[in-house]
Amino acid sequence: MMLQPGDRFFRTDRSHMQPHQEFLRVFETAGAVRHGHFELSSGLHSGTYVQCALVLQYPRYAEKLGAGLAALFSDMSIDAVISPALGGLIVGQEVARALPPAKSDTGGGTPAMFVERDASGALTLRRGFSLAPDLRLLVIEDVWTTGGSTLETIQVVEEAGGRVIGTGALIDRSGGSIDFPVPCRALIDLPIVSYIPEECPLCREGRPAVKPGSRFTRSAP
């Protein structure tokens, strides 16, 4: 996104974090914490990968995690949630479900919209979703590593005339190192070491890297 002199940046607000062991156990119970050699969607390599889809496939776990994340934003007035596909879809829906109804609610609850990648790989707002200029949006993601998808989503919203007032994720694996232009809160702080490919010790050992992220997924012809 375009940065301007004097822009204010935020890093993960740990004062809102709940003790994360209870939520981390949910991931471990579902077998969602994987160990091996992974190439992340950011291009970085890591020996640990959290596959949120494995825990979010269970509706009760998804509801619990979504409610926990939504609770971190109880001090904000939120009109709608927006997430990047695919990783943020389910958690965005569950966070929206747990949020209190907005003043404009017509009975359906807080809307959960999403952006998705077009043929060029850029995130876009499609499927008839529209953003009113005064709509207060919360960007929700599953995992932050570099924050790239979240920053891209914020840019899409701003270009469409919307206003992002905060962003959240189930897991912040960055160690709180990401600069966001809005307040940011994560349910679980789980710093995991990542490497650029040229410095990856697993590559030096000759271990092949697996690409587990949804950005690498392609539909069968």
What would you call each of these model-derived segments?
Residues 1-221:
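PRPP-associated nucleotide enzymes
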